[in-house]
Amino acid sequence: MIQATYLLHMANIYNEGTVGRDKVPVIEGEHVAVMGCGNVAMDAARTAVRMGAASVTIVYRRTEADMPAIQAEYQAALQEGVKFLWQTSTTEFLGNEDGKVVGLRANTPEGVKEYAFDRICLAVGSRPASRIVSTTEGIETDDNGYVLVKERPFGMTSRKGVFAGGDVVHRPQTVVMAMKAAKSVAVGIAQYVDAVKLLSE
């Protein structure tokens, strides 16, 4: 069982030539299930296809109309051969005597069914860690718990001098995107510090 963000990260650094193919947690010929139906799930499913999976199936508890993924991502996944199990609510992951995942059991409109998979990738909805918000006054968040930040200086929260970036500000993405956000926030911090110095002179 793997996290979608981990799969995407390892695939990215494999494509960059930083690690070998054996570090990408999808083996050629495997039957892969991706849990969830957002943009990250679509990315993970398409990545698994490109890594040589025999089949990739997105398992989603709601209908096609309810999926949070944008249509462009969905259509791209279909074109690459990703399959979909709609209204399929997983109740149990199945394993063998060695502890290896061999499939899942789920409630479907036709009743309880079991599906065989070699690997399961988790791309379900997540919320950012809230400890920083609960222990620091004056930091505002949106309805989903993500920290609200300003464009100028980039990354500054509603509390003056406190900055945020990456997965605590938006949905989980790749490490590459987190690094990009960190660089942008660093520029915002530098601008803020320069402004404070200027005002104090």
Enumerate the predicted regions with their spans.
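Rossmann-like NAD(P)H-binding beta-loop-alpha module
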Residues: G17-M51
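FAD-site-proximal beta/loop scaffold in flavoenzymes
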Residues: I2-G29, R119-P172
